[in-house]
């Protein structure tokens, strides 16, 4: 088995190496991503699939995987999780990407469209997840910490998560832990449930079920700079995580959003219209005139870091009906996200919001 603690040139994965890789020109990054996918496909004898969301990152990953499949003579399997949380334009782009790849490459391509189901095979909706578990808020780590701390309080017990939230968590040497999140302790008093279960139920469980049924391993387009969890995973496994419980290839881990946009521009990859146009700023960097990132429309993770107009303010302009459903109270048939945003003091549709370059 490959030793994925090291890069192709024998260097260990650390912060310095990641910075070096991120500074490489796009052509070099494409070659490295191809090399990692060749390594992955060969190791698993072609029994792999690409997670395709219809967004810009996964579309690029699918195109590079198609190149590798054509080189090695393998079938390209694309898997789309139809969670009901995608922008309509992104959902439609899944078929556009499939048709684009069919025309461009001389390989067999299979597109599988799946959705989250309960044990009886009934579709699970986002509203059901919110009602049963709570809202995904701030980050997966913070949501998980809040949920665990609340359980500890209900039992009258101390716990790792409660100490983490109160800021009293210590390292082995007695020093304060860097993993505390006391900043968000006020969320313990929020008048709504908070949970990190959403992604697991809506995406990960269907993916694992598909992997088990088809005996395939996954390829995804996540990047190390997107979160601390993804960064630490790259430090541990590199791009190809052979030794994870669920093996996964992340061939674009060292890429940046600028790389993705440049690749799409150069290769004329189909792009969902919600992104708008790909443009260059004064420094030569790429950006989109529409939304910057798509993902799940109603997700609250990272909202605290967004400049105005944030994702919900943009949604009000671009998708007013979906915005109304999102913000409206639960007892009036909505998702109740408005009151959640009010609680953490995040604007979501005020008339005086600032209009910036990425506004549609």
Write out the residue ranges for each language-model feature.
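ATP-dependent adenylation/nucleotidyltransferase module used to activate substrates
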Residues: 2-259
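ATP/NTP-dependent adenylation/nucleotidyl-transfer catalytic domains that generate, transfer
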Residues: 2-19, 46, 244-245, 256-360
């Amino acid at each position: 088995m490959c030793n994925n603690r090291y890069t192709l040139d024998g260097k260990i994965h650390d912060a310095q190496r990641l910075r070096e890789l991120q500074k490489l020109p796009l052509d070099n990054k494409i070659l490295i991503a191809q090399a990692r996918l060749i390594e992955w496909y060969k190791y698993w004898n072609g029994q792999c699939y690409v997670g395709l969301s219809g967004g810009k990152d996964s579309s690029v990953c699918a195109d590079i995987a198609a190149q590798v499949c054509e080189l090695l003579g393998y079938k390209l399997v694309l898997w789309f999780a139809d969670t009901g949380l995608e922008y309509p334009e992104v959902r439609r782009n899944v078929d556009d990407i499939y048709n684009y790849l069919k025309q461009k490459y001389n390989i067999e391509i299979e597109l599988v469209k799946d959705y989250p189901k309960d044990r009886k095979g009934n579709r699970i909706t986002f509203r059901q997840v919110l009602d049963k578990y709570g809202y995904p808020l701030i980050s997966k780590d913070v949501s998980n910490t809040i949920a665990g701390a609340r359980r500890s309080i209900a039992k009258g017990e101390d716990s790792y998560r409660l100490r983490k939230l109160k800021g009293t968590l210590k390292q082995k040497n007695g020093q304060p832990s860097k993993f505390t999140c006391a900043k968000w302790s006020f969320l313990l008093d929020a008048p709504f449930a908070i949970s990190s279960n959403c992604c697991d139920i809506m995406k990960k469980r269907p993916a694992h079920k598909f992997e088990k049924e088809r005996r395939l391993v996954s390829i995804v387009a996540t990047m190390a700079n997107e979160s601390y969890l993804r960064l630490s995973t790259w430090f541990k496994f590199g791009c190809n995580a052979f030794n994870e419980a669920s093996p996964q290839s992340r061939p674009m881990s060292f890429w940046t959003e600028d790389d993705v946009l440049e690749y799409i521009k150069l290769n004329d990859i189909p792009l969902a219209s919600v992104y708008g146009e790909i443009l260059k700023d004064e420094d030569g960097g790429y950006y989109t005139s529409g939304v910057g990132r798509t993902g799940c429309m109603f997700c609250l993770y990272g909202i605290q870091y967004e400049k105005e107009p944030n994702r919900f303010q943009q949604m009000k302009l671009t998708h007013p009906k979906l915005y109304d459903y999102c913000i409206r109270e639960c007892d009036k048939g909505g998702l109740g996200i408005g009151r959640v945003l009010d609680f953490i003091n995040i604007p979501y549709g005020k008339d005086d919001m600032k209009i910036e370059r990425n506004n549609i």
